Regions:
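Short hydrophobic/aromatic-rich motifs at helix boundaries and adjacent loops
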Residues: 1, 13-15, 27-32, 77-82, ...
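Solvent-exposed interaction patches of small proteins and small membrane subunits
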Residues: 2-9, 65-67, 91-99, 128-129, ...
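Acidic/histidine-rich alpha-helical segments that form the ligand environment
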Residues: 10, 14, 21, 80-120
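Conserved catalytic core of Hanks-type protein kinase domains
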Residues: 24, 47, 114
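Short, contiguous alpha-helical
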Residues: 31-80, 109, 123-159
Length: 159
């Protein structure tokens, strides 16, 4: 039995709730309302796509590479902001970006549901003296997704 079933179900529920909510937003709301990191809703959603993509890659690598594994941590030293800028999420087609985010998460769920349970304690070196297990990586994904969706919710409700 996969220990991440509830987490996967929660991600599916968030996708169901948020896809239509995101697609209903105006251009002004998705482009001009900024969080404390000066990110628009477009940019936050792009970051969430990057998160789904990078975490999927980590899960795959952690099942076959040396342990502990060295793997780039895109979220440190401002790199996630570089990813947002280089990919120009601020000007990405909104419908396409929402679908990209949705389907990246559906694939993430598929990968998590098929993870080799014997590899859950494999680790990657995410920083100096910082090791994160495959289990911790998977368990940390949903709270990160929820944090940023709540942030988007706050921006939507800001007048």
């Amino acid at each position: 039995m996969n220990p991440f079933g509830i987490s996967c179900q929660n991600i599916l529920q968030l996708l169901d709730i948020w896809e239509s909510r995101l697609l209903a937003l105006s251009e002004e709301v998705i482009s001009n309302r900024k969080n404390i990191q000066n990110r628009s809703i477009r940019q936050i959603l792009g970051h969430l796509f990057d998160s789904a993509s990078n975490n999927t890659h980590r899960i795959v690598h952690l099942q076959y590479r040396e342990n502990p594994m060295t793997f780039p941590n895109y979220a440190t030293m401002g790199n996630n902001d570089r990813w947002i800028a280089i990919q120009d999420y601020q000007h990405e087609n909104w419908y396409n970006l929402v679908q990209l985010w949705k389907y990246a998460n559906l694939h993430f769920i598929h990968v998590v549901r098929n993870v080799d349970q014997t590899m859950l304690e494999n680790q990657w070196i995410s920083g100096e003296d910082q090791l994160i297990s495959l289990r911790e990586n998977i368990e940390g994904y949903l709270p990160h997704l929820q944090l940023h969706l709540a942030e988007i919710g706050e921006l939507i409700n800001r007048k």
